[in-house]
A protein has these predicted regions:
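Metal-coordinating catalytic core of metallo-dependent amide/deamination hydrolases
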Residues: 112-127, 133, 141-257
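Active-site metal-binding motif and surrounding structural segment of the metallo-beta-lactamase
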Residues: 3, 51-71, 75
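Short peripheral tails and domain-boundary helices/loops at the edges of structured domains
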Residues: 401-413
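N-terminal metal-binding scaffold of metallo-dependent hydrolase/deaminase domains
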Residues: 1-54, 411
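Non-catalytic positions within long, well-ordered alpha-helices that form the structural scaffold/packing
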Residues: 136, 203, 211-212, 241, ...
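Active-site-adjacent C-terminal substructures of enzyme catalytic domains
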Residues: 246-247, 256-370, 385-387, 391-392, ...
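Divalent metal-coordination and catalytic microenvironments
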Residues: 8, 38, 43, 66, ...
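Metal-associated gating/positioning segment near the N- to mid-region
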Residues: 64-127
Length: 413
């Protein structure tokens, strides 16, 4: 697809070629060109600059007067493919039940797993397609999608095959992750498994097929006191080393049990959640190459603390933002709202939030060579805003979709 965007009010997210991620004070710079143009050739960004340098050619042209253009959002942590909804649990929480109490009573992840077990791949894809179309309308161009609601080999592979089928149908880029350790199901307990032995079983049973069918690019586990502890994490680390699939770990959502330190030492690509942080965990992340992915919409929905964005940024950590889109703890995938929450609740600046939701999100998926910033040769995954005053307005005014159109691979969606 070839296209030229002209008269862009501001073109934002321009970072030097080869920039993998942004950390520290660099995160606070979202470079822009005012009154700009951008050309797309064969689905890639081929040129951009001020309108005074705009080439005269035969490319189809779109006038972006009074509109801003920036990279499409990269949501590096989601559970987009699931069955059914869980609003009944929302009602229970409003009456005082905690996330852990609902899970102990067979709700939560186990509830979703029961619904997945009775759903076909086609049904899972159909439900997820509706959600994905809404996300694209709100500006998401790339998103990681985890399994984890199967809880046995058959249904985990079903979810991963559904993610693959959805990716084949969509212009968005979906990045599949095998969430091998999400909750300990009743059948595993009946067979005498604990969190560690179940994790090893799931890895041993699923990884050969995952590799044969190219069903996942990352491994994940829910490392928490009442879910999967450090012995389970060690099995994930070993499997990552043997399979070549990098680690992305849920950790420190409710308790700090040392998972961050262990994941960083093992070279995990990202550690996600981080609502509860100790000095030891912060020290482990300081200056490391493991990306700290914060999920403010989960904190909002569950009423738990927000991740310490300012501390992480000031400690030279690479910070990304993502939605955690899932039916239980974050039933929404609008990255504009995530950016607003990051500013209002975690005191990130709009520039920091936009970088964390684009380039650093891409880095958390090993995709920053293709996605997340304006650079020649990158995929033409772009947002065109409505006629809003500034790019910062995306993070300021919430509750309204400020995206006029999303361009993916050079094609307007």
């Amino acid at each position: 697809m070839n296209l030229k965007l002209i008269n862009i009010k501001s073109l934002g997210g321009i970072h030097p070629e080869g920039t993998r991620w942004l950390r520290g004070s660099d995160l606070g710079h979202f470079p822009t060109i005012e009154n700009a143009y951008l050309t797309i050739t064969d689905g890639k960004i081929s040129d951009f600059g001020p309108m005074t340098n705009c080439p005269q050619d035969e490319l189809p042209t779109r006038d972006c007067s009074n509109r801003h253009v920036l990279p499409a959002f990269v949501d590096s942590h989601s559970h987009l493919v699931y069955a059914g909804t869980r609003e009944e649990e929302f009602n229970l929480r409003l009456k005082g039940a905690s996330y852990e109490e609902i899970a102990a009573a067979g709700g939560g992840i186990l509830n979703s797993a029961a619904k997945v077990s009775t759903s076909s791949i086609d049904q899972l894809v159909s439900q997820a397609t509706f959600r994905l179309e809404n996300l694209i309308d709100c500006g998401t161009g790339t998103l990681e999608v985890k399994s984890g609601y199967g809880l046995d080999p058959e249904n985990e592979l079903k979810l991963l095959r559904a993610i693959k089928a959805l990716n084949d149908e969509s212009h968005a880029t979906l990045v599949p992750t095998f969430l091998a350790a999400h909750a300990l199901p009743a059948w595993a307990k009946a067979q005498g498994m604990n969190d560690a032995s179940y994790t090893k079983y799931m890895l041993d049973e699923c990884l050969p097929t995952i590799k044969d069918e190219n069903l996942a690019l990352f491994l994940d586990g829910f490392i928490e006191r009442d879910y999967f502890k450090l012995d389970a994490l060690q099995h994930l680390i070993d499997a990552s080393s043997n399979s070549g699939l990098p680690l992305k770990i849920h950790v420190n959502q409710f308790y700090d049990i040392g998972g961050i330190q262990m994941a960083v030492e093992a070279g995990a690509l990202s550690v996600d959640h981080l609502e509860v942080m100790s000095p030891e965990a912060l020290k482990a992340l300081h200056g490391s190459d493991t990306i700290a992915t914060l999920l403010p919409s989960c904190s909002y929905f569950l009423g738990i603390p927000y991740g310490p964005a300012r501390e992480l940024i000031e400690n030279d950590c690479v910070v990304a933002l993502a939605t955690d889109y899932n039916p239980g703890s974050s039933p929404g995938g609008n990255m504009q709202l995530v950016c607003n929450m990051a500013c209002a609740k975690m005191k990130m600046t709009p520039a920091e939030a936009l970088n964390a939701a684009t380039l650093n999100g891409a880095a958390a998926l090993n995709l920053s060579d293709r996605k997340g910033s304006i650079a020649v040769g990158k995929d033409a995954d772009l947002l065109i805003t409505k006629a809003i005053p500034s790019l910062e307005y995306l993070c300021y005014d919430f509750g309204t979709n400020h995206i006029q159109s999303t361009i993916l691979g050079g094609q307007t969606q």
